[in-house]
Curated annotation (Swiss-Prot):
Protein name per its UniProtKB record: UPF0391 membrane protein Pmen_0080
Organism: Ectopseudomonas mendocina (strain ymp)
Localization terms from the record: Cell membrane
Lineage: Bacteria, Pseudomonadati, Pseudomonadota, Gammaproteobacteria, Pseudomonadales
Cited HAMAP family: UPF0391 (MF_01361)
Keyword field contains Transmembrane: yes
Length: 54
């Protein structure tokens, strides 16, 4: 899953350089969604890892 996120990040950077339109705009949108998903997963794993084990 992380490899897909990196792939879409690279595509989004190329799209930003060339201008957002068509497939480039779609790739940038997917990259933004993946960024938010991974950010939420990071925060959840950070909070769960800090809890004392019972």
């Amino acid at each position: 899953m992380l490899s897909w996120a990196l792939t879409f990040l690279i595509i989004a950077i190329i799209a930003a350089v060339l201008g957002f339109g068509g497939i480039a705009g779609t790739a940038a949108g997917i990259a933004k969604i993946l960024f938010v998903v991974f950010l939420v997963l990071f925060i959840i794993s950070f909070i769960m890892g800090r809890r004392p084990r019972m």
